[in-house]
Amino acid sequence: MLEVTLPGEGTPPAEGFRTLHSLKRDLERYFRGYPVDFDDVPVRINVSGKPREVLELVREIPYGTVVTYGDIAQKANTHPRVVGVSLARNRVPIIVACHRVVAADGLGGFRWGLEWKRRLLELEGALPSRR
């Protein structure tokens, strides 16, 4: 459904190395708590319709920001459950930052477990207060 697209056939080896090196460096910085924008990482979204629209909208959520499933659903003109199902299929969760989508009354779900979602949001300084 999703994959990070790295340089392939016909790409000069040095360019591919720079891409991998850059992604590795950005991930290291991210996990050290530095704001990192992954917008320039090429991602192939191999779905269509609402799931694709949802994932594209989630890619636009800035570092340190959270939005609700309902917010994304409203923008995509769909149901919040469609948003949740679409995000559960995300295979590149730091690049397509589905952890930044939360429930109106708490964290909501996360394919890799709520503890990881909580850690990622804490890292970004975006953990919602308990209601």
UniProtKB/Swiss-Prot annotation:
Q: What are the alphabetically sorted keywords of the record?
A: Cytoplasm, DNA damage, DNA repair, Methyltransferase, Transferase
Q: Cellular component terms, GO, for this chain's entry?
A: cytoplasm
Q: Name one GO molecular function term.
A: methylated-DNA-[protein]-cysteine S-methyltransferase activity
Q: What compartments host this protein?
A: Cytoplasm
| SUPFAM superfamilies associated with the record | Methylated DNA-protein cysteine methyltransferase, C-terminal domain
In this protein, the active site sits at C98
Enzyme nomenclature, EC number: 2.1.1.63
Class in the EC hierarchy, top level: transferase
Question: Which Pfam families does the annotation name?
Answer: DNA_binding_1
**Which reactions appear under catalytic activity for this entry?**
a 6-O-methyl-2'-deoxyguanosine in DNA + L-cysteinyl-[protein] = S-methyl-L-cysteinyl-[protein] + a 2'-deoxyguanosine in DNA; a 4-O-methyl-thymidine in DNA + L-cysteinyl-[protein] = a thymidine in DNA + S-methyl-L-cysteinyl-[protein]
One BP term from GO: methylation
The main place the protein resides is cytoplasm
The protein's matches in PANTHER family, at most eight in alphabetical order, are given as: METHYLATED-DNA--PROTEIN-CYSTEINE METHYLTRANSFERASE (PTHR10815:SF13)
Q: What further note is attached to this protein's record?
A: This enzyme catalyzes only one turnover and therefore is not strictly catalytic. According to one definition, an enzyme is a biocatalyst that acts repeatedly and over many reaction cycles.
Instruction: State the similarity comment.
Output: Belongs to the MGMT family.
Q: What does this protein do?
A: Involved in the cellular defense against the biological effects of O6-methylguanine (O6-MeG) and O4-methylthymine (O4-MeT) in DNA. Repairs the methylated nucleobase in DNA by stoichiometrically transferring the methyl group to a cysteine residue in the enzyme. This is a suicide reaction: the enzyme is irreversibly inactivated.
What protein is this chain from? Methylated-DNA--protein-cysteine methyltransferase
The organism of origin for this protein:
Methanopyrus kandleri (strain AV19 / DSM 6324 / JCM 9639 / NBRC 100938)
Q: Which gene encodes it?
A: ogt
